[in-house]
């Protein structure tokens, strides 16, 4: 067992755990759904943390050896390691604070190990001062949601397009099959089964356009806004650098919102 402290006092943490005291507080405080975080979201949040560490190293604020250890830890989470170290309930107070700190603690403790120190050596790698540097739950968490949504949209759009293609084939195949159209639970006027299939395809195509439009908007992020959008505690160059680094990490173009206060609130 190791002992960790927060403003509420001291708690014992099992040696094998990569999360720490703030995650344990969340487990005690928020018994809401009994479910766990989506694994794609965990990976997306790790991508955000990786991009942030890279940007903070670029500005010179984050020590390079610490930053590289955080990046390695984030890469391991992205690869699917430590999946059992994110036990917090998806629904919790603080609009994602517990999730954010769960990630920060896992990355900090793994980074400590990478640097040759035991878990809980927060004087070496701090969940707050290093893993959450130039960040707030209010920018890191919503950005991770956007990254996750973009990633998940790809198989969804592929599946919907395949469905449209098949419905259009059926529209042609059934073009001469006549049936009654119905209104108010009664027979109304004739329509072909092919016309119905074509209408289904049209509706799904419209849905695809809406999803693509939403995905396009998700590429605008508020990283660097910190708590309320003013960028307090973030280096000026970081705000530009973190969008670039996230683009490189995810493989999608991300852009900083024109007004960070608006984007955050």
Language model segments and positions:
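Conserved, well-structured ligand/cofactor-binding cores
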Residues: 1-265
